[in-house]
């Protein structure tokens, strides 16, 4: 017997009060005992969370919230956890003895919503020695541990060999694995399934009779019969499809003639237009090719003319360029001549200005000397006038002083004072402290002598200074000349530089004299160089035209070669005419042959189309008429063989259908009469009792019962005896077996099992040996397996029958097609292909035309070569005389050498011209530069000192004279003497004043005269300087202009320039004559090109026009061809015989078909619109779209499952054959598919009966359950009255309601709903559809009502309601119901899980204090009998004697809260207690 799986332990990590706690679970009952808040509910919540980790369902409320619709926000889970990572795991050992740890990682999510994050996971293959806490925690110290995170846990588990860790992102996957491993009793596929499971656990946890479960007991206890519903749905879908197909066949039959007419006219309409466009496209392509050939030939001719034009244009451009160059050179030469003449005139001006400057220089020097002398005299006169002025002023002052002192004493005193002042002034000025009035006269003579001596010294210095000035001016003149010639030099190096300049002067003069000979030589060489360059240019042009590079020495041999080539080309051109004539004659013959074959082609093509259709139909390559007749005989033989095989297949198919019908009987009865007999006898078919036997056990039971496996089990055979009398409608052998149908087993037989056989001892003297059948049919699974095989075989035979029927009809139609072909096309069908011959002839014609074109091109090329050779000879005639000049390689070097010498000579000439006069002046002054008169400055300084000494001497003499004159004033000691002396002095002063004024007047007059004379001299000097500066500036400008002109200014240069100009004028005239000649030739060439371009433009216009038509047609044609190929209608539209009809005939054919189509599609809006659009002649693709639309319309109208082809044309051919056969077959199929209402009633009744028996079996397990006054619990199953009436009507009175079930407009479900409404008119169905109501009526669960009843005291059987029971009784009753539900789920899911898996059974019970000891003992007994585990929570005063009990005490130590747990293994006499579980690990950190 399979051992049931068990939960071994529950582990809580980091829960509130439980840091790392593992609860070992008892095999029966585990009791959590403790006071309020000890952690009992927390432990159960951890178990439930690990079992169902769905936050949408979890809600842990205490009993005070039992009826509340909303509890705390966290639904009781957030507050049970501690911060950080938390775990809840279940250690399970299943029926296969596999250890599985399933659990969840929980973690509080920060926020006001107090959410919890849950991640389910599983660990498989964990060794038994390892506890879950060892995996989930890590020791940090001796009494400290750390909780691992989920990634760390995964890493630790995966490091263990053979241990698998799996994390789940979906609760469905988590529960799927738990179901496969036998942890949960039912596969939880959806959230609704999880909700049912949670509601069951919740009802178990909180105890009592859960209204959520009792109201939905049908959903919890009764399995959904999805197979029956699906069978009904498939049957209805098949019937619906069958009816739709039959309706489509009827419509198709009515439209058959329309289809034929539509496809025929559409093919004519579109194919005619299709081939007309194809013909026009081919014609346009041929025209475009002809125009393109003419265009290319014209372009080639134009290219030739353009080449000639380009060559002549190039030569003309070269001549024009040369002319432009010559004109430029001529203009340059003329300009050069003008420049030379200008330079000559400029040189004359320069020479004239140089002579004027020399004269002005001489006059300027003379005038400078005169001005210098006048300046000196002016200075002397100014000094005398100043002295006279001073003397007059002094005398006037003295006289005024004396006149003011009319008082004698006063006057004398003043005079005495003035005399003393004069004496002091004389002492200071003469530096004579010993001077007195007595010795003043002596000193006056001395100082008069000094004055005379200073004057004489000044005159001597003036003479020396004049001589030094003359020498200094010569040195400065010479030095300035050297600086002008050689640039800045020092005064000490001036003589050496001047001597070198005078030494180089003769060589420069010699070079300047060579300018003219060198120019003449250079002119000759340049003329020869230009001739050489012209010859090289002619050679380059010749090489360019010839396309090869030739050396000058090769030209004579080339001339001889070109002359021979001209002779050969003249001979080859003469032979071209004869060949051209022969090719044209052959071309005309080919055209006549092509016309003849074109007339034969349409008849041959029609025969080939018919032959190709026959080949496609037959699959044979028909190469001659003999094969055609032989194949007709083969068709007749094949038709006979196929007909025989078809009849055989039909017989086999009928036999299989009969077998299917027999196996499809309800309850497995092979004969439908057995079902009626079983109802009549009040028994049950044996096959119905064993209907649930597995397919593996079916062979054994089939052999065990042998022929009696189709017998009827009745409770009492004696009651059946009277029914057997007069029994006629029954099988030949009817087996009746006595037994209880509810508890029937196979113990009535004595059986011995053998290999694939059994021996049954029927009696002491009668044994039966039965082998296992190869195809067992006992039991629903075996029958369904056999039916599936038979269905496949029937479908295969049906397909084969349809194929054979189609082949017969196809063979008949193929034979008719062969007959028509022999009568119409056999005479011409096997002739040679005229189109192939036409293609060959067209190929030959193309070759001849290409040969003609090539011949014309070759002839034209030869003519061009002939002309080119003649031009080459002409050019060589000009080049050969110039070969010696071309070979002169030193000419350029000589020109460069002479050019350099001429540049040196011109430079020397310019030097002589610029500095010749200066060198001439410098030559006589060379000796002056040897000594620099530096003493001139010292002499000037001495002269200035002498002037100052003379002026001082004059002032000293004047001061002494004044003292001498006032000498009498020193004797004024008394007033009389003073008056007398004053009168004399006044007279003397007046006399002296008159003399001084006269002297002053003379000095002024003389100063005015000298000033006037000095002004005149200065003006003359300024005028000379201005004239000198102007002429010098003009000379510089003229010299600069001459330098800017850049040409030599000599007579030979003018002659050379004039000769060069005349030479260029002659060359220009020659070039212009050649240019005029080229322009005339170019005009003729351009006229020819214009005519060719006009022709070319016309050809291009015509070509582009027709090419545009071709391109547009191609774009449309490509779209047309793509549409044609994509839709597979090319074979229908491309009718080659139409290619030989002209456009008018095809257009007429298309128009006629269009008229017929308008009438044919008048009632079809879509086709009418598409046809109207297709009439646009510019959009040929729309006709194809119309044809495709017609095909699509026909495909839609012709069912592809009826007609086995995608081509509507072939479908029309098959329609007449296939539609009749399908109509007959589908009608029969509908009759077979239609299920009778009686059969439906029987299926539902049998299902209800089977479920009632299953509920009775479940009730047997609850009969001994008692809680308080409740002595027993049972589940009552009843059929609803309205639904029972429906079943009776379906089975007994179905003939009265055939209007519903035989209606083609109603499905069976809808008919069933209508019948239900008819039987229960008082019921309001609301807005639900009949289809929905009918589908509900096909579900047997809707026919049943389930109620829980309890047997309580004197009241007997009562409906289990919480109000009628005590709390303990309600808890016990609810637990009983939950056990029944779990058992039902296990049986329902038995087929879905492995046969070696018996799932775990575990329920909860919180707050077990409401149960008395007897009730708790009853729970223990129930758990032991049902192999169920139970976890109950009880107060401290309850300690069951059996099972495992955990004492929970919550303690607080150092602000840390933990639960102290002690475990006991019962305390009855026979059960020794377990030692206390070790204290839990202290909380880490």
Swiss-Prot record:
Task: Give the keywords, sorted.
Answer: ATP-binding, Cell cycle, Cell division, Chromosome partition, Coiled coil, Cytoplasm, DNA condensation, DNA-binding, Nucleotide-binding
How does this chain assemble?
Homodimerization via its hinge domain. Binds to DNA via its C-terminal region. Interacts, and probably forms a ternary complex, with MukE and MukF via its C-terminal region. The complex formation is stimulated by calcium or magnesium. Interacts with tubulin-related protein FtsZ.
Q: Which Gene3D superfamilies match?
A: 1.10.287.1490, 1.20.58.850, 3.40.1140.10, Immunoglobulin FC, subunit C, MukB, hinge domain
This one is known as Chromosome partition protein MukB
Q: Which residues bind ATP?
A: 34-41
State the Gene Ontology BP annotations.
cell division; chromosome condensation; chromosome segregation; DNA replication
Query: According to its UniProt record, where is this protein mainly located?
Result: cytoplasm
Q: Which PANTHER family match?
A: CHROMOSOME PARTITION PROTEIN MUKB (PTHR42963), DUF4476 DOMAIN-CONTAINING PROTEIN (PTHR42963:SF1)
Domain notes for this protein: The hinge domain, which separates the large intramolecular coiled coil regions, allows the homodimerization, forming a V-shaped homodimer.
Pfam families recorded: MukB (PF04310), MukB_hinge (PF16330), SbcC_Walker_B (PF13558)
Superkingdom: Bacteria
Its source organism is Yersinia pestis
GO CC annotation: what is one? cytoplasm
Flexible hinge as annotated region, ranges = 666-783
Q: Tell me its family.
A: Belongs to the SMC family. MukB subfamily.
Q: Does the keyword Ion transport apply?
A: no
Q: What is the lineage of its organism?
A: Bacteria, Pseudomonadati, Pseudomonadota, Gammaproteobacteria, Enterobacterales
Keyword Chaperone annotated? no
Q: What does this protein do?
A: Plays a central role in chromosome condensation, segregation and cell cycle progression. Functions as a homodimer, which is essential for chromosome partition. Involved in negative DNA supercoiling in vivo, and by this means organize and compact chromosomes. May achieve or facilitate chromosome segregation by condensation DNA from both sides of a centrally located replisome during cell division.
Q: Where in the cell is it found?
A: Cytoplasm, Nucleoid
Query: What Gene Ontology molecular-function terms does this entry list?
Result: ATP binding; DNA binding
The record, for InterPro entries, names: MukB, MukB/SMC, MukB_hinge, MukB_hinge_sf, MukB_N_dom, P-loop_NTPase
């Amino acid at each position: 017997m399979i051992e049931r799986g068990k939960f071994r332990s529950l582990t809580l990590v980091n829960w509130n009060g439980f840091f790392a706690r593992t609860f070992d679970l008892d095999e029966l009952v585990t009791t959590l005992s403790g006071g309020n808040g000890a952690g009992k509910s927390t432990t159960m919540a951890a178990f439930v969370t690990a079992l169902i980790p769905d936050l949408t369902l979890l809600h842990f409320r205490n009993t005070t919230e039992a009826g509340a619709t909303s509890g705390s926000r966290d639904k009781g889970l957030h507050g049970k956890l501690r911060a950080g990572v938390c775990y809840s795991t279940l250690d399970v050992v299943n029926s296969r003895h596999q250890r599985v740890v399933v659990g969840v990682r929980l973690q509080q999510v920060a926020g006001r919503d107090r959410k919890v994050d849950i991640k389910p996971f599983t660990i498989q293959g964990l060794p038994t020695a390892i506890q879950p806490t060892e995996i989930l925690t890590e020791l940090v110290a001796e009494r400290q541990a750390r909780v691992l995170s989920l990634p760390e846990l995964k890493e630790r588990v995966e490091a263990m060999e053979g241990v698998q860790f799996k994390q789940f992102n979906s609760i469905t996957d988590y529960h799927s694995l738990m179901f496969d491993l036998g942890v949960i009793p039912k596969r939880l596929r959806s959230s609704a399934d999880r909700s049912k499971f949670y509601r069951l656990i919740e009802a178990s946890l909180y105890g009592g009779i859960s209204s959520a479960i009792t109201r939905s007991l049908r959903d919890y206890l009764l399995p959904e019969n999805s197979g029956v519903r699906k069978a009904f749905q498939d049957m209805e879908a098949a019937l619906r499809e069958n009816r739709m197909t039959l309706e489509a066949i009827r419509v198709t039959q009515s439209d058959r003639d329309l289809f034929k007419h539509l496809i025929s006219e559409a093919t004519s309409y579109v194919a005619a237009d299709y081939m007309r466009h194809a013909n026009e496209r081919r014609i346009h392509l041929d025209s475009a090719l002809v125009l393109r050939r003419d265009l290319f030939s014209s372009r080639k001719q134009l290219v030739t003319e353009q080449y000639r034009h380009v060559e002549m244009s190039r030569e003309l451009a070269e001549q024009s360029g040369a002319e432009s160059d010559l004109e430029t050179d001529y203009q340059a030469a003329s300009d050069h001549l003008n420049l030379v003449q200008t330079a000559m005139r400029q040189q004359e001006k320069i020479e004239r200005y140089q002579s004027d400057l020399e004269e002005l220089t001489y006059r300027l020097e003379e005038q400078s000397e005169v001005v210098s002398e006048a300046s000196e005299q002016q200075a002397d006169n100014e000094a005398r006038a100043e002295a006279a002025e001073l003397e007059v002023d002094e005398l006037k002052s003295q006289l005024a002083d004396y006149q003011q002192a009319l008082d004698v004493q006063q006057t004398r005193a003043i005079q005495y004072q003035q005399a003393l002042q004069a004496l002091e002034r004389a002492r200071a000025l003469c530096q004579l402290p010993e001077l007195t009035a007595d010795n003043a006269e002596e000193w006056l003579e001395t100082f008069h002598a000094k004055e005379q001596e200073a004057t004489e010294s000044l005159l001597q210095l003036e003479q020396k200074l004049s001589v030094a000035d003359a020498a200094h001016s010569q040195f400065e003149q010479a030095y300035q000349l050297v600086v002008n010639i050689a640039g800045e030099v020092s005064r000490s190096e001036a003589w050496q530089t001047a001597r070198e300049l005078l030494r180089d002067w003769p060589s420069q003069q010699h070079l300047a004299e060579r300018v003219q000979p060198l120019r003449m030589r250079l002119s000759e060489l340049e003329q020869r160089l230009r001739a050489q360059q012209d010859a090289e240019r002619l050679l380059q042009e010749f090489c360019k035209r010839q396309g090869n590079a030739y050396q000058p020495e090769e030209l004579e041999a080339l001339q001889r070669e070109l002359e021979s080539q001209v002779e050969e080309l003249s001979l080859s051109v003469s032979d071209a005419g004869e060949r051209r004539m022969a090719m044209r004659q052959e071309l005309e013959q080919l055209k006549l042959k092509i016309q003849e074959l074109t007339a034969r082609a349409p008849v041959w093509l029609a025969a080939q189309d018919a032959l190709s259709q026959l080949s496609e139909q037959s699959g044979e390559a028909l190469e001659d008429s003999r094969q055609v007749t032989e194949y007709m005989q083969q068709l007749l033989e094949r038709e006979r063989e196929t007909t025989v095989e078809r009849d055989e297949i039909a017989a086999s198919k009928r036999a299989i259908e009969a077998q299917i019908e027999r196996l499809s009987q309800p309850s497995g009865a092979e004969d439908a009469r057995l079902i009626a007999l079983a109802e009549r006898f009040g028994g049950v078919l044996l096959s119905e009792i064993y209907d649930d036997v597995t397919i593996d056990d079916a062979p054994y039971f089939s052999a065990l019962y042998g022929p009696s496996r189709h017998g009827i089990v009745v409770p009492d055979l004696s009651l059946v005896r009277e029914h057997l009398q007069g029994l006629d409608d029954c099988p030949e052998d009817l087996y009746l077996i006595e037994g209880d149908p509810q508890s029937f087993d196979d113990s009535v037989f004595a059986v011995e099992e053998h290999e694939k056989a059994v021996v049954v001892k029927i009696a002491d003297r009668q044994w039966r040996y039965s082998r296992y059948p190869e195809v067992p049919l006992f039991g629903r699974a075996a029958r369904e397996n056999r039916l599936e095989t038979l269905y496949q075989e029937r479908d295969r035979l049906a397909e084969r029958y349809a194929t054979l029927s189609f082949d017969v009809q196809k063979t008949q139609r193929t034979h008719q097609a062969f007959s028509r072909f022999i009568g119409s096309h056999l005479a011409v069908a096997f002739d040679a292909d005229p189109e192939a011959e036409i293609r060959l002839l067209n190929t030959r014609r193309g070759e001849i035309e290409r040969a003609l074109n090539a011949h014309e091109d070759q002839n034209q090329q030869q003519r061009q070569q002939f002309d080119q050779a003649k031009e080459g000879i002409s050019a060589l005639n000009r080049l050969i005389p110039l070969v010696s000049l071309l070979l002169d390689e030193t000419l350029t070097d000589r020109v460069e050498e002479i050019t350099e010498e001429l540049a040196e000579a011109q430079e020397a000439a310019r030097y002589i011209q610029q500095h010749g006069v200066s060198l001439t002046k410098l030559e006589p002054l060379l000796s002056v530069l040897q000594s620099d008169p530096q003493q001139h400055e010292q002499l000037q300084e001495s002269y200035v000192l002498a002037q100052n000494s003379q002026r001082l001497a004059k002032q000293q003499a004047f001061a002494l004279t004044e003292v001498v004159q006032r000498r009498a004033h020193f004797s004024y000691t008394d007033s009389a003497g003073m008056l007398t002396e004053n009168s004399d002095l006044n007279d003397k002063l007046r006399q002296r004043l008159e003399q001084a004024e006269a002297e002053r007047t003379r000095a002024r007059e003389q100063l005015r005269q000298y000033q006037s004379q000095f002004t005149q001299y200065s003006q003359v000097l300024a005028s000379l300087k201005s004239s000198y500066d102007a002429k010098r500036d003009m000379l510089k400008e003229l010299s600069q202009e001459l330098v800017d002109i850049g040409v030599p200014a000599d007579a030979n240069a003018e002659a050379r320039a004039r000769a060069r100009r005349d030479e260029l004028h002659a060359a220009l005239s020659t070039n212009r004559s050649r240019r005029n000649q080229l322009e005339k030739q170019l005009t003729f060439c351009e006229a020819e090109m214009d005519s060719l371009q006009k022709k070319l433009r016309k050809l291009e216009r015509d070509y582009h026009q027709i090419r545009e038509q071709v391109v547009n047609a191609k774009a449309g044609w490509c779209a047309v061809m793509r549409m044609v190929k994509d839709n597979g209608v090319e074979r229908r539209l491309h009718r080659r015989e139409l290619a030989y009809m002209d456009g008018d005939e095809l257009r007429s054919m298309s128009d006629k078909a269009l008229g017929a189509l308008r009438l044919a599609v008048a009632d079809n809006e879509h086709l009418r619109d598409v046809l109207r659009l297709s009439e646009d002649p510019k959009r040929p693709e729309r006709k194809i779209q119309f044809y495709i639309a017609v095909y699509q319309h026909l495909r839609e109208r012709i069912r592809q499952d009826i007609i086995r082809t995608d081509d509507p044309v072939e479908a029309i051919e098959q329609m007449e054959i296939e539609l009749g056969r399908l109509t007959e077959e589908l009608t029969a199929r509908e009759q077979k598919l239609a299920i009778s209402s009686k059969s439906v009633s029987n299926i539902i009744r049998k299902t209800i009966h089977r479920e009632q028996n299953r509920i009775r079996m479940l009730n047997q397990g609850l009969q001994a359950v008692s809680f308080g006054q409740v002595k027993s619990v049972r589940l009552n199953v009843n059929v609803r009255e309205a639904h029972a009436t429906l079943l009776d009507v379906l089975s007994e009175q179905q003939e009265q309601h055939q209007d519903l079930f035989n209606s083609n407009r109603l499905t069976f479900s809808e008919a069933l709903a209508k019948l239900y409404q008819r039987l229960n008119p008082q019921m309001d169905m609301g807005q639900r559809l009949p289809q929905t109501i009918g589908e509900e009526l096909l579900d047997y669960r809707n026919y049943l009502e389930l109620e829980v009843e309890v047997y309580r005291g004197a009241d007997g059987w009562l409906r289990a309601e919480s109000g009628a029971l005590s709390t303990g009784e309600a808890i016990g009753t609810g637990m009983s119901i939950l056990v029944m539900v779990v058992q039902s789920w296990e049986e329902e899911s038995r087929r879905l899980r492995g046969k070696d898996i018996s799932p775990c059974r575990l329920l909860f019970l919180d707050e077990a204090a409401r149960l008395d000891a007897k009730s708790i003992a009853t729970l223990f007994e129930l758990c032991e009998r049902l192999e169920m585990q139970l976890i109950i929570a009880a107060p401290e005063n309850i300690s069951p004697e059996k099972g495992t009990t955990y004492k929970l005490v919550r303690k607080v130590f150092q602000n840390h809260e933990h639960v102290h747990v002690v475990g006991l293994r019962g305390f009855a006499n026979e059960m020794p207690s377990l030692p206390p579980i070790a204290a839990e690990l202290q909380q880490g950190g």
